[in-house]
Amino acid sequence: MYNNNQNHHNNDNNMNKDEPTTIYPEFISISNEIKTNGSTNSYLNNIRREMLSMVNSGNNNNNNNNNNNNNNNNNNNNNNNNNDSIVINMDTINNNNNSNNIDINKSGYSQISNTTSNDNLNKTLLGNNEISQINDIDDDSSPEFIKYKKFISSLSYITFIGAAIVLINQKKSVYIQFHAYQSFYISMGVIGFQFLLIWSDILSIILWSLYLLFTIFMFLKVSFGGYGNSTIYKLPIIGNLSEQKAKLRSQEYSRYFKYHEDLFIKELREHKQALIHQSNLNRNNNNSNNVNNNGHQRINSNSSSVVMSGDVESMLNSSGSNSSIYSDVQNDIGTNEE
């Protein structure tokens, strides 16, 4: 498990070398925040990679448009750029820990909305998410996250108030929820016995003394002890009930979480499609504008040539008339001399 998480961190480091910084700065800030606060969460990593791929695709579209504009300004139109493609790198966490590359053709907006391609994309993004696979009380986590989980679990033994706060804020980890449920049930049991033993001060003191020793023991063991099934310290009856409740609650939360993950990634994909579609429209508009400009230039050149030819003809006609006038004057002079 440590090697797998190390591979994910290496993939993040490799991705950071090519992260764009010139477009969608809000996505970059969100991506950096996700990297800082949730690098061990598979869902957050998927969202971060999806946003980075969308930003990369937007930069590629802008570069292609700039290249097309430069070529059009130099009257070197090249229509072969219509078949360019965007490569979306989606490194999702699956059983084989592989990366999948999906080519999306930019030449048609309708091609992206194909049902088969959408199904494959959904399977790639959401098919093998580790939060929906909870088989043991010691759920999978990275080594650097174990200390945090142990600390939160130990806080749940600070009376039923600490357990309730942990249950409200921690819904994914089975390990944390197990200790919170176990502490909550023990606290409620002690409070219930206190009402039954309220008539005896000695029994009440013994009861609360045992509860205090139990909470101190569990706090120290969970905080500084080992991590795993062998160091869970599960009580015979309450422990089994706590384990079942923790697994059931985590599974319900994972389904709810996965549903919102589907919606969020769907919105990202739709926004990416809109970017590609807008890029195609801009490129087509640029091409049509360049064609119109070239047509106007040809018309202007033809009109100027016509004007020039008309000027030449008028000049020739005027010179001819002048020569005829000159000949008439010469004839008049000759007749006068005779």
Curated annotation (Swiss-Prot):
It is found in: Membrane. Residues 9-20 have a biased composition (Basic and acidic residues). Residues 328-338 have a biased composition (Polar residues). One of its GO terms (cellular component) is membrane. The keyword Ribosomal protein does not apply. Glycans are attached at residues 37, 83, 97, 105, 114, 122, 229, 240, 286, 302, 317, 322. Its main location: membrane. The chain crosses the membrane at residues 148-168, 178-198, 202-222. Residues 1-20, 55-92, 279-303, 316-338 are annotated as: Disordered. Residues 59-92, 280-294, 316-327 have a biased composition (Low complexity). This is Putative uncharacterized protein DDB_G0292342. It comes from Dictyostelium discoideum.
